[in-house]
Each structure stands twice: as C-alpha cells, then as structure tokens.
Amino acid sequence: NFLIELQSRDGTHHYARLRVPHNIPRFFFVTSEGDEMEADDPLGNRRIDVVPTEEIIGEFLPLLFPGYQVVSKGMFRITRNTDVEIEEDEADDLLEAVRDSVTRRQWGGVVRLETEHGMPSNLTEFIIQKMKLKPFQVYSVKGPMAFAGYMALNDLDYPKLKDTPYFASFNPDTQPVDKLFENIAKRDILLYHPYQTFTSVVDLVQQAAKDPAVLGIKMTLYRVGNNSPIVKALMEARQRGKQVTAVVELKARFDEERNINWAEEMERQGVNVVYGFVGLKVHAKLCLVIRKEASGIRSYVHIGTGNYNPGSAKNYTDLGLLTSAQDICSDVTDLFNVMTGYAVRDNYRRLFVSPTCMRSGIERAIRAEIERHKREGNGRIVLKCNQLVDPDMIRLLYEASIAGVKVDCLVRGICCLKTGIKGISDNITVRAILGKFLEHARVYWFGPLEDTEKSLC
C-alpha cells in the first residue's frame, strides 16, 4: 500500500491510499545486451535489472492524481489476525460457516503495521490513528517488504545460480503400476518422499479408480492443492460405479476456499463427502481401498505423514506406508467409520489416534522403555517431529533421561525441551535438520535401533 499526502490547488491537504494490485508481476525485468561482464560471471553475457513494481508506481504517482501536488508518500503493509472463530456447534451448515469465516478473515483485527523506513511521521501517525493501533504494533522496515514475492526471482533462467534439480526414484516394489496391489499384498512398502516419488501414491488411487475389482475407496483430504490428480481419480472412481467417500477438512488453514470448491465438485460427481468433526480437525492422511479378490474381500491402505499433494511432496520429507496387513486395515476401516459418524471407538489394534489414544499410547511406550532400561540397560528413544511443546510429554522425557535412557530428538520447529540440565536432561540430544527439503515426517522409536520390532511411525 501507498499512503500519499496531496495538496489541492486551493492549498488544502488530503490523504489517499493506493493499493498495489495483486494481479500484476511483483518485478519488471529489464535486459541490457552487450554490457561488459566478467568472463567467469555465472549470468553469462547478459545483465538484467530487477525493478520492483512498487518503485515504478511510486515514481509515477503524480500521473495518478492530476490537479494535485504530491507532498509526501510512503509505503506500508498491514498484517491482520487470520484466526477467525467458527461457531461450529451453532452452524446449521458447516460449509457455509467456513465460507463465511474466509470472507471475514480479510477484515480481521490489525496485529502489525509495517512502514517504509524514513516514512514521514505525519503519514505514520495518520495510519495509527485511523486503525487505533498501539506503538508496539508499528515496525519501521529497512529494505523491501513482503519478501514472499521475491520467490519470483527464482523464475529467472540462471541454472548456475540454482540448486541442481533433484529427481526422485521409484520404489521398485511399486513397479509395474498394474501389479501394485499384488505387490502390496506380498509385503508392506515404505515410501520416503521426496527421495522416492509421490507418484506411487497417485498411482494407487488412479489404479483403484480403474480397477474393476475395486469396490470402494475412502480417503481423507486436508491440503490437496490445485488441479489435484488424486481428487480427479476419486471422481473418476465414482463415475465408474465405485463407492467413494472423501473426508474433507474444511478448516485447513488458508486452504478453506480450495477445499470448499473441491468438496462441492466431488458432491456434484456423486462422491460421498464428509466434513469431519465439530471442534476437531481431521489431520490424518489415510486412504483405504476395498477390493474383491478370488480369496474374498481384501483391503489396502496408505498411511502417510504428508498431505495428498504432489506439489508439496516434492519439497517436504514425508513417510508413507502401503500395506494390506489385516490388523492395520481393520483399524483404518474402524477409524473411517468413526469419521463418517457410524461408530465410536477409543482404542485400536495398531494405530495411535488422537485425541482418544495417541497421548496415552506414546506415554505407555516411554514408560515401558524406562522399565526396560532398568532391566537391560540399553534404553533408547528417538523422536522426530515438527514441534515439541507439550509440558507433560517433556516432563516424561526428562524422567526417561534421569533413568538413563538415551533420548534423541529431531525437532524441525519450536522445541521447549531444554538440554544440558545437569541430572535432568544429560541424556537428551536435540537437533534440527536444515537442508534442501522441509522436514515433515514424524517418527517415534522406542528401543535399541537394531530392534525393529520396537518402532512406531
């Protein structure tokens, strides 16, 4: 945004706000040919001047206000509170309630005002008064604002300045595609994205849609992205006469509108769309395929730590399990019955499900490892997660450390556990992996690393 102080011909002063349009490029690229460049310059014999759009607009502001003199100007940016409360228990139609909340988000309360460094004080004060802000909410920014827009620079054709593209491999057990169900029936397949391609997961749903032996598909959808091949496969499956259920989380933050559009499109195609629970988000990533085979009805399951989004799967590290193990498939079937409103269940055979039994299951595993360490002396816990902030869980890890259990934590984001406290956290190590990909997998491992029976993912 620009705030401009204008003076009319009669000497009166006015203030005008000008919003930089979102539907034009953030930068204009001006190429100069023939400029002298160093021989080893990675850009080659080209020079490109990058001009931010807001600088061009600021330079030509007088053209937008004929008859007025531009006295002063300054750029500012507003950050609003995007947490809009949805009265789910009072809403007759959850979809419409979420749609209304998305509309209201653009009018959320202002939590931060960023102003261009050197912006005239009278302009800053004008905004503060109009928006009724406190001094602590105002930030003077040296340099450009809205850095997310600078990702446009990555579109420049300078491969020498970029990372070498990573090409994922196929897990050999997922090939050939037309034998995928046969291969899963033989043994479990663990996928590690993006090192192994997410295409195998897309193949699973697409094969299920086309396979005449498949009776039905059930799937949870949290963030699926635009032009989703998975959603299209679900709709194709319904068109081919299969029973298809999609549990769509409408309250996935900043993806609400996209999920609403997909949900409505699937409903038009005859897919049974369910919107989850009041007061909870469906964050599990599950796909259940029911298939009629010569030996009877058999289920196949995909359980993942990442969204069913081929786009983000190229940049996030995630794990996915393809299995036809009866106990896991029965658990997933029961869980879908809970999510679609046909059952109540607190405990499962192999799955830890929140909010009913995940906490208690992990706590039992930690306490069991403490007791095993007292007997055998080689206790080990490995945790890989996005955040570690739960006070009770942190205290329990301290308890494990005090007992002598070696605890390794790989935490991508916020970690409230403190290492190096003598006598309390001596046996705990916390690391964060920073690299090309965003670490997103969740793994909890209890017991010696060579003992694979003690792992839980």
Indicate residue ranges for each PLM-predicted region.
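N-terminal localization/anchoring segments of enzymes in phospholipid and broader phosphate metabolism
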Residues: N1-I381, E399, A403, C415-E439, ...
